[in-house]
Amino acid sequence: MKTNYEIRYAAHPEDAKSYDTTRIRRDFLIEKIFVPNEVNMVYSMYDRMVVGGALPVGEVLTLEAIDPLKAPFFLTRREMGIYNVGGPGIVKAGDAEFELDYKEALYLGSGDREVTFESKDAAHPAKFYFNSLTAHRNYPDRKVTKADAVVAEMGSLEGSNHRNINKMLVNQVLPTCQLQMGMTELAPGSVWNTMPAHVHSRRMEAYFYFEIPEDHAICHFMGEVGETRHVWMKGDQAVLSPEWSIHSAAATHNYTFIWGMGGENLDYGDQDFSLITDLK
């Protein structure tokens, strides 16, 4: 197996609005998440969130404590949320073992223990997407499925944004330190998410897009309300959203995305909305 990581530094909005396409993609887009028998991570300075993925194919992959953590184990001072977006898989955390099927999630609390990822079938490997944030205390591990989620049906087909927001690793379902994760599924014929757009200056966010055909693409919108920029993305890619930025998208096909947040509070409704007509 191989572990890869890179560090992404935070950007000031006054600086970011002058970035060209190459710089925007370099600083905010995470293109390489799933590579066979690799664990790939981005250590972000936005609330020190780690965004990554593991794709075990015939091997057991270990979640290694990367150097920026300066810790004996990855979870020594961190909590983690994991979603399986591939075939059936297994996550082991210390003496605990969790089986995760497609679109099932797992919360891991902080503590000194080894974490491993494996697939049940190498021909249909699991794909583990994860977000991790610093944690001030330990909360119990827990597997969460859509049956456990707080579900909000939003939008309409006429507005091209009919979707179900599955709040899964949130404080309405289980205790966490600062991590909040969920999964939004867009209905056929709907392509817009998070519109009208909003920001939440108390929390940063990361979006991971999947369930989009290979010959289609997603256009993610970011930036300040009066200085928006776009990032064209493919499936199985993620994007960082600073606390000062909107985070919205439209695509050429319906899709699903996983959102993860961390920061000052755990209030999902703490959002500052903008009028669609104010966007520039």
Task: Indicate residue ranges for each PLM-predicted region.
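Conserved metal-binding segment of the jelly-roll/cupin
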Residues: L100-K120, W232-H253, G260-G262
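A short glycine-rich, His/Asp/Glu-containing loop-to-beta-strand
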Residues: P36-L69, H162-E205
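Glycine- and acidic-residue-biased ligand/ion/polar-headgroup-sensing regions
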Residues: Y43-V60, L69-D95, M195-Q237
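A short secondary-structure junction signal
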Residues: G94, Y139-V144, L179-Q180, V191-A197, ...
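Hydrophobic, proline/glycine-rich low-complexity stretches
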Residues: M1-A71, L75, E79-Y83, D278-L279
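Acidic, low-complexity central loop/insert segments
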Residues: G86-T134
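Double-stranded beta-helix
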Residues: A122-G182, A187, A206-V231, I258-K280
